[in-house]
């Protein structure tokens, strides 16, 4: 993170935005070559590899996965061959597991997600507190802004675990509404992409 006064931002967020614009432009201009591994797909993968390599220097595996996944679906939308896409998916999933289990802290976070009660006071603490938050919400929630878990119990509740706080404050019904709105947002985005008159706007 880079601090500017009282604010801070992650450089990877800016890189992510620039990469999406670049890929949308490049695929719209040279999309007819996307099925050519050397002249079409290869150069785009090279740019992606450079970007995710820089992000991993931070290191930030979560953003790396998000960036790679976004570009993957852009390649799918641009008409890349299924054989190439399947190969990329296999290599990508294998690469993620290698990155997870070659760093002890990542492996601990992954295993803690599968069984947080194994280490409830350290690696499993955040997951357990998020479950408490969701369970406390019940059907209708405790009320907007009245969460107890966000008062120093659940770390990073405004980013990584915002959904748990939503569940506590709005309850099961409120969470269903939020999920429904997210699906509506996705559907509207897909509809806009499909009906967009130019390839750049559609991919973007």
Briefly describe each language-model feature range:
Residues 138-170, 193-196, 200:
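Long extracytoplasmic/lumenal interhelical loops at the membrane interface
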Residues 1-126, 164-204:
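Hydrophobic alpha-helical transmembrane segments of multi-pass inner membrane proteins, especially
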Residues 124-145:
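Extracytosolic (periplasmic/ER-lumenal) interhelical loops and adjacent juxtamembrane/interface segments
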